[in-house]
A protein has these predicted regions:
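Generic N-terminal leader/processing signal
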Residues: 1-2, 102
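Sec-dependent signal peptide recognition
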Residues: 2-8
Length: 274
C-alpha cells in the first residue's frame, strides 16, 4: 500500500519530463540510443537522425507498470528529399502529449533536427509547449555522435512542470559486426530533484540475423512513465523483419528521484515500415 501511495505522489508531483515516451528498444538499452535511434524512436530521442533512415513507418506501443499504463501511436515519413518528419501521440496516467519532429541533412553524414512537444494535463487541462534542437554526425562507419538540447525554452513555469533544459550527448559504436554500443550522458544545469548529471548505456546484440538482445543500465537517467529520473536496468528482445518489427522490454527501477523505491515495467511495440 505504501509503495502504491508513494508512486501516486510522484505521478502527481511531476506532471512532465524531458522524454515523453521511451520505446521497448530504448528501455532495453537503459534509456540510451540517441546516437542511433531506430525508425520512430527519433521523434522522441533525436529528430535529426530521421534523415538517415529513409522509410515510412507506423508504430503502436503499450507499457504497463505498478500503477498504470501508457499508450503510444506514431508515424514517420523519412522518404522525402526536402525534409523528414514524424508525429507521435502518447497517453499517460498524468497527461497526453503530442510530439513532432523534423530533420534535414546538410551533407551526407550530417543532419540537423527540431522537435516540438505539446503536453496537456489530464486533471487540470493545463497546456505546455516546448522545443528541442538536435544534430547527428556519422564520423566513421563505426562511430556516430549526436547532440540534443531538449526543453530549449526553460523558465520558472516550465521548471514547475519538471521540464528542465537538458543537454544529451548521444554516441553509437560498432566494435564488432553484430554488437552495437550506446552511451548517452545527460546534463540539466537547473535540475532540482536529484543529481544534475546522469548517464544511460546499453548494448544491442544481433542473434541469427533477425533477432536482437538488448541490455542497458541507467544511472540518474530518465524514467518516462514515472516522470522522473533514477537508477536501474533494462533488458529487451526484438525481431526485425523485412517490413515489420516487434519489441519487448523489462525494466527494473532500483530507486527514483522523489523517494519512490523498487518498481518494474513491461513494454511491447509493433512497427510496420515501407
Amino acid at each position: 500500500m505504501l509503495k502504491k501511495i508513494s508512486l501516486g505522489l510522484i505521478l502527481l508531483a511531476t506532471p512532465s519530463l524531458a522524454v515523453e515516451y521511451q520505446s521497448p528498444r530504448t528501455l532495453g538499452l537503459g534509456g540510451a540510443g540517441r546516437g542511433g535511434p531506430l525508425l520512430n524512436d527519433s521523434i522522441y530521442l533525436n529528430p535529426s537522425y530521421a534523415s538517415f533512415t529513409p522509410t515510412y513507418s507506423l508504430t503502436g506501443g503499450y507499457l504497463w507498470f505498478d500503477k498504470g499504463r501508457n499508450y503510444n501511436l506514431s508515424v514517420e515519413d523519412s522518404r522525402t528529399e526536402m525534409f523528414q518528419a514524424g508525429m507521435g501521440y502518447t497517453k499517460r496516467e498524468q497527461n497526453s502529449t503530442l510530439n513532432l519532429g523534423a530533420s534535414k541533412t546538410l551533407i551526407s553524414n550530417l543532419g540537423i533536427g527540431v522537435g516540438a512537444k505539446y503536453v496537456i494535463d489530464n486533471d487540470t487541462g493545463s497546456k505546455t509547449m516546448n522545443f528541442s534542437l538536435s544534430s547527428s554526425y556519422i564520423a566513421t562507419p563505426w562511430a556516430y555522435v549526436s547532440v540534443v538540447v531538449d526543453n530549449v525554452l526553460e523558465s520558472a513555469d516550465t521548471q514547475a512542470r519538471n521540464l528542465y533544459r537538458t543537454v544529451y550527448l548521444g554516441t553509437k559504436f560498432l566494435p564488432l559486426d553484430k554488437v552495437t554500443l550506446y552511451v548517452d550522458p545527460l546534463y540539466s544545469p537547473n535540475y532540482k530533484l536529484g543529481p544534475k548529471a546522469g548517464v544511460a548505456a546499453g548494448a544491442e546484440i544481433t542473434v541469427m540475423s533477425d533477432f536482437l538482445l538488448r541490455l542497458g543500465r541507467f544511472q540518474h537517467g530518465e524514467i518516462s512513465h514515472l516522470n522522473t529520473r533514477g537508477i536501474g536496468n533494462g533488458i529487451g528482445l526484438g525481431y526485425l523483419g523485412p517490413k515489420v518489427r516487434f519489441d519487448y522490454s523489462f525494466t527494473r527501477i532500483n530507486s527514483a528521484d522523489g523517494g519512490y523505491g523498487l518498481s518494474t515495467s513491461n513494454s511491447l511495440e509493433t512497427t510496420v515500415f515501407f
